[in-house]
Every structure is written in C-alpha cells, then in structure tokens.
Swiss-Prot record:
The chain crosses the membrane at residues 672-692. Interacts with glycoprotein L (gL); this interaction is necessary for the correct processing and cell surface expression of gH. The heterodimer gH/gL seems to interact with gB trimers during fusion. HAMAP family: HSV_GH. Gene3D superfamilies: Herpesvirus glycoprotein H, C-terminal domain (2.60.40.3190). The keyword Glycoprotein applies. Glycans are attached at N21, N24, N51, N76, N148, N206, N337, N365, N384, N411, N538, N573, N593, N652. This is Envelope glycoprotein H. The gene is gH. It comes from Human herpesvirus 6A (strain Uganda-1102). Disulfide bonds: none annotated. Pfam families: Herpes_glycoH_C, Herpes_glycop_H.
Length: 694
C-alpha cells in the first residue's frame, strides 16, 4: 500500500489568516532528490514512486491556521491507490456537448421607477408611489430566513468537496424509502435525494465557493449552465438511468432553467406539473417516478423566488405571487410528508400588520378581498400570528357573499374557487373563536352539492384549471366526509361522468384535511366515517349512515333498507364522544306553517334526501328573504316527490319534515290580516241587514 499525501498550494498570503508567531524561517533551497534538504521553517514532503522521487517543501506558516486544519481533516491521507482509481471513475460525467449555456429571457414586464421617488415607510416596509400604484422592492421582502449556524451539507459530499461554511435553510421530506432534502443558501441551492439504489445531488446557483477535492474537478460535474449559474450533477453512473430518468431527458431541465430568472413563469410551470400529478393520481404514491422532477422544480422555484427579480413590483402583485408560492408549498406538503424544517420569509410577515384602513397601499379595487389574502399568507406561520377582529369581519363578509351568490346551485367561477381555497386554508389552520370557525366550515361545506360536483368534474376533464388554488372544490371541506366514492358514483352516473370519479377522489384525498381538530364538536369523529357535519350557531348536526357520535339521534324511516340516514344533534358546548350506539332519541316533527314575521327557522339548514340515494344537499338559511326564495314554488328549488324529501334542521336541535303545506310561507302581515277580518265583518253585517230587509 502506498502512502499518498495530497499537497494543496494555498495562494492566500500568510497574513490573510489569523496572526501566527513563527519561531524560525528559511528560504526554500532544495537539493536533489538523492539528497533532500530539511529546513526548520518548512515542512518537507517526499513522494516516492517506482522510478521517481519528488520533494516538496511548504512554509509552516501556511499550515498553521484553523482553515488548514479543516482542509486536512477533510481529506483521507491513507487511501490506497486501488480505491482511489475506483473512486475516480465511479461518478457520472455529463456529456460536454449537452452543457448548453442557456440564456434566460424574462417573459414578463419589468418595472422601472423614477429614482427621485422617495419611499413612504408603512410598517417598516418602503413603499414607492407611482401613478396611483404603490411598489416595493422585491429584494426587501423576499429574503429567505437562514439558520444562524453554519449549514451541514450532505455527508455524501465530503468525499468530493471541501467543507463549506455557509448559512442555509433546510427542509427534509420522506417518500416511501426515499429522503428528499433541500438546502437553500444566498448563493446556491442543493437537492439531495437519498435512495436505496443510489443517491443524487443537484446543486444550482453561483458555485464559486464550492471547491472540489483532487482528483475531482468542478467542470466534470457541470450538467447545465446559464450566463450566471451552474447546475452540478453528482450521481453514480450505474444509478442515473435506473432511478433518475428525467435527467436523461434533459428537456425538462432545459425548460426549467430557461425560466429560472422569472419566478412567475416557474410558478406556472409548477402548477401545471402539480395538476398533472393530481389528475394522474400520483400524489402520495411512494413509487411515483416523477417525485425527483417535482422536488427539483420546487427547489428552483424557492431559490429563484428568494434571489431573483430584485427590482420594484406593485404591492398587490408581490402578495399574489407569494400567495401562489404558498399554494405550491401546501400542495407539496400534502403529497410528500415533511419531517423537518420549514421555509420562511420573515419580511412578508410585515404585511400582516396592515388593517383595512391601510389597504389603499395594496389596491384600490374594493372587489379584491385583501383581508382574505393577507390572512392566507399567515397560514405559513400557523399559530404565531394574531388576526384582528376587523379582518375576521371582512373575511366573514367575503365568504357570505360567495355563499349567497351560489347557495341556490350555480357554478363556481375560478375566482370563487381561489378565494374558497384560501378561506378553507384559513379555517383549517388559523386559530379563531369557535363561532367564526363553525360558521366558516358550515358555509364552505354547504357549497358542495350535486351541481358543484358535476361542474367540478367537467372543469377537471377539460383541464382548464390554471393553478392549484382554483382547482379546489368545497367538497374537500372536512365537514363533508359524506362525499365518498359511492356518493360521487351516484351523482356522476346521472351526468354520464362516472369515468372521472377516480380523479375526483384523488383530488379530495389531497385537499381534504386529515382530521377535524379545529371543530371541537366533531373532533372525535374518525376521518373514515362518511358523515356530513352541519355546525350551526347553537347546535351541530351529524348526518351519517350509522351511529357515530353521542347526541340526540333520529332515524329516517322512509328510505329503502339499503339506505340508512341517522341525524344526530349535539348541543354547542357538549364534549365530543365517539360511539356506535344510540344515546338519546327524538321524534320527527311535521312543519305546517312558517311565519314571515319572527323567522324562527332562520340560522337553520334545509336538507334534501332521496329514499334510495340518501342525503343529497344542504342549504343554510340565514334570513327570511333566503327562506322565501328557497320555498317559493315559482323558483322550483324544492321539488318534493315520492322519492325526494326535505327536512328542516332547526337551530334548537329539532328536526322537521317540510310537507307541501309547510313550504308555503305565510307572507301576509298582521296588519293586512286585521284589515281582511274587518272587511269580512262589515261584509257579513251588510249581508245580515240585507237578509233582514228581505
């Protein structure tokens, strides 16, 4: 075994390191290889081969610094020549003719501001007004939060590169047996994939601080280049074609790097990839071959977002772009389990301080729900934020407007779906008072009905949804777990769309929260229970095919044997107790008349069910006008027949059958009734006098 010691010529002068006390010094005057000279101020290296001897002398001052110790600690001075030769040829070297020097061309408008514009400081953010629009400099708000300590890069890189002292943000995910780790630094991004078949490291950015150990050269690992950055690929030859096929087809990588300087184009690219992944049913599959490709694009998106496009941009556009970034974070977290780390942009948190009186800095368009947008941005911080009551009021109004627009079975627009996606995320993540939480879940869940299911299916089949937000459906609400495979089959079969049922179930499995911990009244329910939960202000109704929760229950008896409907009422402050038996019962009441004066049945829900198909839809009634619209025979919204029936689930926990008599609301005021009675009395009195005269 030959002893091989690699000598590194350090070009930095001695005074570049910490001061050293040199006890002696000497000029380097070598003899010949037969008579080497040993000097006190030098370290002498003698290298012997078969027919040659080489002598190197290095001044001790170059080897006395901390960094030198780190460098020598990073190399193996006892490695055999045989192992060394094997190591040299083990790694994949990209073909030189494929290393294109890509020239990214920004595809969107770049904003330039007059340099004389003085900023207005709003909550520590510099705002630049120009022609009625406020701008911020992207570099000031998109700074990623890096750890305070030096980053520990993957152990597999120790063989190839010297230690790098740099701060970074790190996030790790598990997919089956694979582990995906992203490292983000101000200069470069690393995606490290650990796989039983072999690891892969992709490093993109300004890699001038990355120094490879002999015999490796950085140029041997360059896979692609742009004008400013390199993409390094470190993977063994025997692994690349078996495990990481997307690298062999470099089209995806080339297209990604072509857009690397344009964040919005990258976000659009990821949205398209995410939607394709959903529609193929590949999300959450541990053997999905496209996960490495998705993780690479995810890393490029965040790296470019935090380092590119540093100039001015309208505030609203900055916020909408960050909204889209959070939506892909949400999607990836649903598809791939996060085990460690998070990515934060602390300056964006400053926008959460804005109240409705400050919204003119963001937009003057009153139709945009700024409160919803800002509160959605807070989902990245979970419980570490406080949302003001003014924002919650604004959010409640936004949701109420969408509900009133579509409560009577009209198709949701893309804009509505995007807003509902944000509202659902807010309801499922941001802590709020129980009243608000229940109200949001109720309205979002009640927008799921057969019309919405058919509309959603047609939208998915047409592949028209442009991003991962407006592909959302309220049927993914955690309170609508009754939307099961069999329920979708029932609805889609009537519309001849049953062939798309599996796609919709995949979407629901991704977008529906795994539990109901935010709703105290039903948090004990198993996620596998096919139950609908109606969280009214003072009572919660759970509609299920069996007994699942402690409460006052009612069994519907008009259905066929194969269809079972059990309605359980749980008072507001009751403790959630899961059960499989009847705890207490109540009778079904018959509703004969509804007064238009007191609106006893406002804040209640009208439920439609079929004797064969079971529960179909629910409509929350807020006020008397909505009740009149719903029950007006001319609107054909309630059409009872021998199979279809309607129940009114009242705010006090009672359940009423709505007969045809009950559907006709008494809309006559008490004053008119008195007038009619007086007229009738006068008429009768006149008739009496007429008879007497005869």
């Amino acid at each position: 075994m030959l002893l091989r010691l690699w000598v590194f010529v350090l070009l930095t002068p001695c005074y570049g390191w910490r001061p050293l006390n040199i006890s002696n010094s000497s000029h380097c005057r070598n003899g010949n290889f037969e008579n080497p000279i040993v000097r006190p101020g030098f370290i002498t290296f003698n290298f012997y081969t078969k027919n040659d001897t080489r002598i190197y002398q290095v001044p001790k001052c170059l080897l006395g610094s901390d960094i030198t110790y780190h460098l020598f600690d990073a190399i193996n001075t006892t490695e055999s020549l045989t192992n060394y030769e094997k190591r040299v040829t083990r790694f994949y070297e990209p073909p030189m003719n494929d290393i294109l020097r890509l020239s990214p061309v920004p595809s969107v408008k770049q904003f330039n501001l007059d340099r004389s514009i003085q900023p207005q400081v709003v909550y520590s953010l510099n705002m630049y007004p120009s022609q009625g629009i406020y701008y911020v400099r992207v570099v000031e708000v998109r700074q990623m939060q890096y750890d305070n300590v030096s980053c520990k890069l993957p152990n597999s890189l120790k063989e190839l590169i010297f230690p790098v002292q740099v701060r970074c943000a790190k996030i790790t995910r598990y997919v089956g047996e694979d582990i995906y780790t992203h490292f983000f630094t101000p200069d470069f991004m690393i995606l490290y994939i650990q796989n039983p078949a072999g690891d892969l490291t992709m490093m993109y950015g300004n890699t001038t601080s990355i120094n490879f150990k002999a015999p490796y050269k950085k140029s041997s690992f360059i896979f692609k280049q742009t004008l400013t950055d390199d993409l390094l690929l470190i993977v063994e030859k025997d692994v690349i074609d078996v495990q990481y096929r997307f690298i062999s087809d470099a089209t995806f990588v080339d297209e990604t790097l072509n857009d690397v300087d344009e964040v919005e184009a990258l976000l659009l690219k990821f949205n398209n990839l995410g939607i394709q992944t959903l529609l193929r049913g590949d999300c959450k599959k541990p053997n999905y071959a496209g996960i490495p490709q998705m993780m690479f694009l995810y890393g490029i998106v965040h790296f470019s977002y935090s380092t590119k496009n540093t100039g001015p941009m309208p505030v609203l556009r900055v916020l909408k772009t960050h909204e889209n970034l959070l939506s892909i974070d949400s999607f990836v977290n649903r598809c791939v389990n996060v085990s460690e780390g998070t990515l934060q942009y602390p300056k964006m948190k400053e926008f959460l301080k804005y109240e409705p009186s400050d919204y003119s800095y963001i937009t003057k368009n009153k139709s945009i729900s700024v409160s919803t947008l800002l509160t959605y941005l807070a989902t990245a911080y979970e419980s570490n934020v406080t949302i003001s009551k003014y924002k919650w009021t604004d959010i409640a109004n936004t949701l109420q407007n969408i509900y009133e627009k579509h409560m009577f079975f009209t198709n949701l627009t893309f804009s509505d779906r995007e807003t509902l996606f944000m509202l659902a995320e807010i309801a499922n993540i941001i802590p709020t008072d129980e009243r608000m939480q229940r109200h949001m879940q109720l309205l979002i869940g009640n927008l799921c009905n057969p019309v919405e299911i058919v509309s959603w299916a047609r939208m998915l089949t047409a592949d028209r949804a442009p991003n991962l937000e407006n592909i959302y459906s309220p049927c993914a609400s955690p309170v609508r777990r009754d939307v099961t495979n069999s329920f979708l089959k029932t609805v889609l079969t009537y519309a001849s769309l049953d062939r798309y049922r599996s796609d919709m179930m995949e979407m629901l499995s991704v977008y529906r929260p795994p539990n109901m911990e935010r709703v105290a009244a039903i948090q004990c329910l198993s996620p596998s229970e096919p139950a609908a939960s109606l969280t009214l202000p003072n009572v919660t109704f759970v509609i299920s095919p069996s007994y699942v929760i402690k409460g006052v229950s009612l069994t519907i008896t008009t259905t066929i044997v194969a269809t079972s409907i059990i309605i359980t009422a749980i008072p507001l402050n009751s403790t959630c107790v899961s059960t499989n038996y009847k705890y207490a019962g109540q009778d079904l009441l018959v509703l004969r008349n509804i007064s238009s004066q007191t609106c006893e049945f406002c804040q209640s829900v009208v439920m439609e069910y079929d004797d064969i198909d079971g529960p179909l839809q629910y409509i929350y009634i807020k006020n008397i006008d909505e009740l009149k619209t719903l029950t007006d025979p001319n609107n054909n919204l309630l059409v009872p027949n021998t199979r279809t029936h309607y129940l009114l689930l009242a705010k006090n926990g009672s359940v009423f059958e709505m007969s045809e008599v009950g559907i006709d609301i008494d809309q006559v005021s008490i004053i008119l009734v008195i007038i009619y009675i007086l007229i009738a009395i006068i008429a009768l009195f006149g008739l009496y006098r007429l008879i007497r005269l005869c």
